């Protein structure tokens, strides 16, 4: 594990909840499944006698449920503000997940200061993607922050947002990430945080994991057989 990963211990539970939300959104897109279903699966696995995953924090679940409900509106807003040289569908999926978490907090969670949502997103991007991703994520969220009150007003009428969205907007995800167009810091650099190293001394924080299809399917099948 890199030294930068170990520094991640210094953050509070909200930061860790955001990171786990990013992990779950990334996994959901990679596996083409509902992120809410992943949350339900994690809850079941965490209740096992010998759990292989940590419980999902309440704030992680709040983020996932919020993003799942408002995904179309969030993607319209992100597509409107992303740097002209990029489209939402062509970004690494982990960067899309980071942008969706942060934009949901900025627009739908009044308890989180806009600046906090941006700073946390940029730092998560530096953990998972690198400086290049951090830069355009920061620029995109800053652009949204300058119009956040307008975006909140528009978000109150999602049907109108979707109706007004131009056909040219990139409704992500449109296709698997194209390596030929990838940033230097692509999805290949995204790795799960080692739960044992990161959280061994903490009881209430979240474990960041992106489970592979085979592992999750195997556990789920075993539990189904036992029941």
Swiss-Prot record:
Domain of life (superkingdom): Bacteria
Stretches with biased composition (Acidic residues): 178-189, 201-214
Segments of this protein annotated with the region Disordered: 165-189, 201-227
UniProt keyword terms in alphabetical order: RNA-binding, Transcription, Transcription antitermination, Transcription regulation
GO process terms (BP): DNA-templated transcription termination; transcription antitermination
One Gene Ontology cellular component annotation held by this UniProt entry: cytosol
InterPro entries registered for this protein in UniProt: NusB-like_sf (IPR035926), NusB_fam (IPR011605), NusB_RsmB_TIM44 (IPR006027)
Molecular-function annotations in GO: RNA binding
Biased amino acid composition, Basic and acidic residues: 215-227
Family annotation (SUPFAM superfamilies): NusB-like
Function per UniProt: Involved in transcription antitermination. Required for transcription of ribosomal RNA (rRNA) genes. Binds specifically to the boxA antiterminator sequence of the ribosomal RNA (rrn) operons.
Family: Belongs to the NusB family.
Xref: NCBIfam families: nusB (TIGR01951)
Name this polypeptide is given: Transcription antitermination protein NusB
Source organism: Corynebacterium glutamicum (strain ATCC 13032 / DSM 20300 / JCM 1318 / BCRC 11384 / CCUG 27702 / LMG 3730 / NBRC 12168 / NCIMB 10025 / NRRL B-2784 / 534)
Gene expressing this chain: nusB
